[in-house]
Amino acid sequence: MAERVEIVYDRGRWRLFNAMRREAAAMMAPLRAAHIDCLAYGSLARGDVSDGSDIDVFIPGQQSPTIVEAALERHGVRPTGREIVQATPGYAAKAYIYTAELRGYSLPLVELRPTEREFYSFAGSIRPEQVEAGLRVPGVDKRLMLIEPTPGGHVESHVAGREGEVAKLLGVGINIVLERVRTLERRRRVGRTGVYLKRVLSPEESFSEVLRELSLSRPALRRRTR
């Protein structure tokens, strides 16, 4: 049986959690008003936030970045930066719209593969109404620890060797769990490697035109945009 360690949150951590949830709800509001589906994921969904936690509102599906940007602009949200990122040649390219340090929105620019979609459930994800309700869900953190919320904090346990059990608990396929275990264990051994592609956009550029431009010289990206 896996060793389970209980973590009890102090008042400061609960205050941080509640403040970040309010901020996430405000960030999601412009998208909800435009009927754009969105998720909060990671530590914000699980509850194990820290001072270094980010708020990345993820927009699933292949929503037009132009429509997303227009929805944000209507509510006075101004980006501080925008970029296209493709982590590896095989991964989906994504648009990132930053609004402050450790705050922003992301959306895929190509159709996601099943394991890419399931990553968000693997990490723990919730919808806007669940953000507002204070719901916390189980998920796996960057240490490959399964985080299971409790009334006073959470219980954490190792994922390695329990991939099937964890997949069942999170409602995801075994492949995403095995893939993340391989990726994170390799990262532990060799360190974090740089991303395959990162292209910062100027205020005048659109995501669609830059993606089209990049795909002309990047075969791996071009294959994912077909």
Model features per residue range: what roles?
Residues 1-37, 45-51, 61-226:
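Catalytic core of pol beta-like nucleotidyltransferases
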Residues 42:
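Short loop/edge segments at beta-strand edges and connector loops
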Residues 54:
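Charged, often glycine-rich, active-site loop that binds/positions anionic groups
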